[in-house]
Amino acid sequence: MAIKSDRWIREMSEKHGMIEPYAENQVRFDKNGEKLISYGVSSYGYDVRCAREFKVFTNVHSAIVDPKNFDEKSFIDIESDVCIIPPNSFALARTIEYFRIPRNVLTVCLGKSTYARCGIIVNVTPLEPEWEGHVTLEFSNTTNLPARIYAGEGVAQMLFFESDEVCETSYKDRGGKYQGQTGVTLPKT
């Protein structure tokens, strides 16, 4: 397996729609010249942006977290340019970008140091061969203070690894439960 470069990411996005919308280079300023947390293609990865839809974890309904029987009332929905995650809490969001992963590629997501250095951890499971959709992002606020997440700005980096052989069964082949997801997607069994 080899990590893929900016040239490969650009070509796959422009010719095959691997990342839509695709941002060339690292975007660091908005149209008014204000600083952003960077997003777009980098040397060996792609920094994704967070959309304006969030689900923030709450316990107003005294729910129990059960991945086999998840209660949607465990979250409150927020649509905003900024999401405030309560101390020691959790939020879900999604990428602005829609991904179509090639059959011989595995994509791994890592958090951005800008957030990690503030105690905000991003978790995403690997994007498997032939998976497609908006990526659901999981944010953990590990601090005892409220934390901000900015929509429209970089939140995580995707790394693309191309295998030297094609897998026998892709995510699409086995009918993966998150195939084609749009919006923030809650746990499924």
Swiss-Prot record:
Catalytic activity: dCTP + H2O + H(+) = dUTP + NH4(+)
EC class of the enzyme, as a word: hydrolase
Pathway: Pyrimidine metabolism; dUMP biosynthesis; dUMP from dCTP (dUTP route): step 1/2
Active-site residues, as the UniProt record annotates them: 138
Binding site for dCTP: 112-117, 136-138, 157, 171, 181
GO annotation terms (biological process): dUMP biosynthetic process; dUTP biosynthetic process; nucleobase-containing small molecule interconversion
CDD domains linked: trimeric_dUTPase
Keywords of this entry: Hydrolase, Nucleotide metabolism, Nucleotide-binding
EC nos: 3.5.4.13
GO function term, MF aspect, one: dCTP deaminase activity
Family: Belongs to the dCTP deaminase family.
PANTHER family recorded: DCTP DEAMINASE
Subunit and interaction comment: Homotrimer.
Function noted in UniProt: Catalyzes the deamination of dCTP to dUTP.
HAMAP family on file: dCTP_deaminase (MF_00146)
Name of the molecule in the record: dCTP deaminase
